[in-house]
Amino acid sequence: MKSSVSAAFGKVLLAATLALCAIGKPAFAEDAKYPSQTIRIVVPFAAGGTADALARVVAENLAQRWSSPVIVENKPGAAGNIGVASVAKAAPDGYTLALVPVGNAAVNPSLFKDLPYDPIKDLTPITELAVVENVLVVGGNSNIKSLAQLIERAKTTNITYSTPGAGSMAHLGAELLAHGAGISLTHVPYRGLAPALTDVLNGEITMTFAQLPNAKPFIADGRLRALGIASPKRSSALPDVPTVVEAGNLPGFEATSWYALMAPAHTPDAIIRKLQHEIAAILQLPAVRDVLDAQGATPVGNTPEELAHVINEDTARWSKLIRDAHIELQ
């Protein structure tokens, strides 16, 4: 199994590297006049939420810096696959970009049998925009007070967990927990985050992994109880809440959400570099960091090669979990 994962890892890295290295003289000519028309950033979800907020703050600031229109277009549907596929099929000229979350870049290829795009062959990395922490929560009135207690309870009782849909980080986080702790959890998928969180709040569902900015207000007023942060270290926003690693004795546990900007494959390298340079600078602006803080997001702004490595690692990690835990779309 190790050799097959290594082989897959190598193929992903090679494809990403080839995509990034497809550079020639025309690329520099494109860079000199880029942008000369409206840039579209496609968000594969409905307006509102972290992905939309990230795209809009980047679009607004790019437009200001370049004195050229940059618009956000929301194309929801099929767990984000419709919007991302539309960009994968667009002209590779730098004028159509995609806001791509971890699920669409590194998870869905292992979950969907007929995915309408290949994130490695059909898309080129630009930069990772931000990372968002997830937190494991139960209802405030639940008699489960700790992750250790939840794990013990799951050995004799049916524990349910809600998600915004199959393949979401809430789904994978719960399955990673179940797989690591040797327990069974019952998946109850919803059509979106709001209803998934609502039924944990009212006690219909036992638990969920929620993005920190969505859960924090309810944790603060006692309507939710935080059992563990799904990141390698504790969150500065909830410093008293242990990590899942600490609370559940699960070494290496991590289920972090991230959002990246990607372009169609074969987009000139000089344009990719120009976009990355500008966006990395934008992510350091105080006003932009304030917007990200409000979303519970930590800015990144890494290079295309570094983003390719992140996609590479997460693809290998999540595909292994999906295979080992026999995770399927429901």
What do the predicted segments below correspond to?
Residues T50, L54, V58, G83, ...:
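Stable alpha-helical elements in mature extracytoplasmic
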Residues N104-D114, L176-G180, M207-V241:
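A ligand-binding cleft/hinge motif common to bilobed small-molecule-binding domains
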Residues E30, S36-T38, H179-G180, A220-D221, ...:
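An extracytoplasmic/periplasmic, membrane-proximal ligand-sensing/linker region
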Residues K89-Y95, V102, S110-P195, V244-N249, ...:
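Hinge/capping helix and adjacent helix->loop/strand transition within the periplasmic-binding protein
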Residues F28-K121, T157-T160, A166, G182-M207, ...:
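N-terminal (or domain-start) structured segment
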Residues M1-S36, Q330:
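Short, low-complexity disordered leader/linker segments with a strong preference
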